[in-house]
């Protein structure tokens, strides 16, 4: 396997927070919060940082290194918060050694993107065909099964070059969770997680790395968060959902996926929205979370962090749709409010 390595985006999120309950001098002193993790929400987190910096006052240094790296740094307590599109496992939570909270930020769609001359957005993918492409069983662009779903497409007699993530990735977790639901062979042979043993393909680091490989290499096919495909002007496919409809990944179809699973979201918010019910639901979607400890070691940093998360899950939601992330449903925001009020430092709640 040839792996293209792309330097992780490191973004200094200049965010200023007015921290209540501390002295005026302390409130004016800069508070620095360090975080690391998912590339999936980077476009939105970047936007949030610009807007929030104009309103308030603490610097947040966020390393966009992938969900796997973010979880590792969070467990090691080398950052103030982690960020992931794949939930931590029970084993990882035990390793963290504290009360771990997954705070949903938004939901997003994982899309199938490709580079075939003359083939634009709208190529249809049935679940079994998509799984078999990543298993290496559907290896040609003009495979009869792919042609059957796309009778009008001019698909060449060329090898399909699969592109996947080379780093630990929540985007991979969402995608492989979906493949495990629709393909028994994938579930038993490969499985799901932030990292898996890929049967075939090239690797790219981060969503931006996969997008770069696909954009530069003819006959490739990979998976990225929707915003990365749009930003790079890359075509993406429609995926057949459980209702039998080929559905485009849009803000509306992603929201439909979330709505379909809203009643079953567990107390800890660890859930995927893959292969959901609903005629208009896009079948490959999930939350992106910020990971925090329920008991903060530093009252000032802890207050700054939960204040920002309150803003992000309220005022910050209005910036999500323009980047094609699905805002959190209001009923879910009400639950998150209750979760944030449980965050403490030195035994005292950090929010009213």
Please report, for each region that a protein language model flagged, where it lies by residue.
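Glycine-centered signal
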Residues: 3, 22-24
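Bacterial N-terminal signal peptides that target proteins for export
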Residues: 1-12
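Flexible loop/hinge segments at secondary-structure junctions
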Residues: 24-352
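Bacterial N-terminal signal peptides
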Residues: 11-21
């Amino acid at each position: 396997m040839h792996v293209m390595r792309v330097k992780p985006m490191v973004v200094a999120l200049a965010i200023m927070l007015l921290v209540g309950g501390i002295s005026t001098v302390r409130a004016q002193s800069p508070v620095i919060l360090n975080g690391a993790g998912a590339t999936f929400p980077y476009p939105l987190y970047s936007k949030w940082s610009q807007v929030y910096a104009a309103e308030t006052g603490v610097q947040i240094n966020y390393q966009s290194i992938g969900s796997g790296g973010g979880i590792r740094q969070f467990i090691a307590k080398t950052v103030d918060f982690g960020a992931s599109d794949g939930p931590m496992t029970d084993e990882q939570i035990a390793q963290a050694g504290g009360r771990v909270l997954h705070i949903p930020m938004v939901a997003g769609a994982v899309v199938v993107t490709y580079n075939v001359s003359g083939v634009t957005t709208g190529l249809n993918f049935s679940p079994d065909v998509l799984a078999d492409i990543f298993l290496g069983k559907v290896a040609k662009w003009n495979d009869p099964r792919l042609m059957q779903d796309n009778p009008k497409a001019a698909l060449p007699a060329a090898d399909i070059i699969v592109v996947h993530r080379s780093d630990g990735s929540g985007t991979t977790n969402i995608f492989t969770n979906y493949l495990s639901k629709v393909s028994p062979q994938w579930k038993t042979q490969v499985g799901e997680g932030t990292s898996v043993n890929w049967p075939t393909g090239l690797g790219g680091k981060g969503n931006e790395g996969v997008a770069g490989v696909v954009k530069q290499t003819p006959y490739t096919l990979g998976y990225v968060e929707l915003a990365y495909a749009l930003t790079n002007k890359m075509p993406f496919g429609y995926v057949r959902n459980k209702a039998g409809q080929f559905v485009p990944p849009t803000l509306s179809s992603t929201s439909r996926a979330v709505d379909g699973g809203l009643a079953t979201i567990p107390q800890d918010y660890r859930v995927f929205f893959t292969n959901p019910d609903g005629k208009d639901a896009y079948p490959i979607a999930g939350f992106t979370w910020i990971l925090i400890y329920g008991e903060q070691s530093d009252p000032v940093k802890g207050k700054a962090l939960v204040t920002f998360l309150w803003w992000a899950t309220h005022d910050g939601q209005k910036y999500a749709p323009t980047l094609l992330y699905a805002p959190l449903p209001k009923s879910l925001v009400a639950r998150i409010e209750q979760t944030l009020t449980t965050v403490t430092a030195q035994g005292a709640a950090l929010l009213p």
